[in-house]
Amino acid sequence: MTAKTAVVFSCAHSDPSTGNERFDWLGELIYEVNPSYIIDLGDGADMRSLNTFDTRYPEAIVSQNYEQDINCYNEAMDRLRKKPSERKYKRPYWIGFEGNHENRIKKAIAHDPRLQGDKYGISFSHLQTDHWFDEYHEYTNSAPAIADYDGISYAHFFSSGNYGTAMSGLHHANSLLANRNHSSTCGH
């Protein structure tokens, strides 16, 4: 069995109010490590424009813009994939997971279907996950997808109980092992 190398990252929260230079640095690391596959555990897009908690604060809403959120995310994904040099690299396999911040798009459409539209509305397709990832795992049954690679389970978060809330606690790793009995990696 050949050993595989993975680069796993999560919760990049690309946001128009913050520079995307960090994605250049992560991209350089990715090409330096030259992994077999890369796993993005979700929340790559902050999607502050669809944050329902900010509706109480009008000054927070004014600075938010859906188009800027989408453009910032796609620029970040592009920066991750730029080669730092002309050296030959083997192309890694890119695996992505939908996080709760990306899921804000689907929630907004479910709340008000009139918002949906590929050209003039909001749409999950604007994230271009089919372009950025070889394999992408969307939420299923209102919870993050779980996928196994090389004997390890990956998800944006693992649910605790039947309510779909994220497993948490003082000793999160211990809770994951105790409840899942399996090697697991999550973001959130």
Question: What is each residue range found by the language model?
Answer:
Residues 1-78:
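N-terminal active-site segment of His-dependent metallophosphoesterases
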Residues 11, 43, 99, 187-188:
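Active-site glycine-centered loops adjacent to acidic/histidine catalytic or metal-binding residues
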Residues 72-185:
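Conserved catalytic scaffold of divalent metal-dependent phosphoesterases
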